[in-house]
């Protein structure tokens, strides 16, 4: 399944610099090349953007039909 702009994706690896963890969900806002990397926006459930990160294709996957949301509190920097 290919990932397109505006798709929800799940991190498969931590991004410590951005304070993000595997399992966090974001929205693709730009595709680099032929999908070698994605610009992904991560937000709180309240709608506040917490990070926009360039993520390699190997570090994200599409949201699946059987995925369930899970809440974690964002740690302060």
Residue ranges of predicted features:
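Basic/aromatic-rich interaction segments and small domains that mediate binding to polyanionic partners
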Residues: 3-66, 71
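Extended, low-polarity transmembrane helix blocks
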Residues: 75-76
């Amino acid at each position: 399944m290919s990932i397109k702009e505006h798709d929800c994706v799940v991190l498969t690896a931590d991004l410590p610099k951005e304070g993000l963890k595997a399992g966090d969900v974001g929205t693709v806002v730009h595709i680099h090349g032929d999908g070698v990397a994605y610009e992904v926006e991560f937000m709180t459930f309240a709608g506040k953007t917490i990070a926009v990160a360039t993520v390699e294709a190997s570090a994200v996957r599409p949201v699946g039909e059987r995925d369930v949301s899970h809440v974690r509190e964002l740690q302060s920097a």
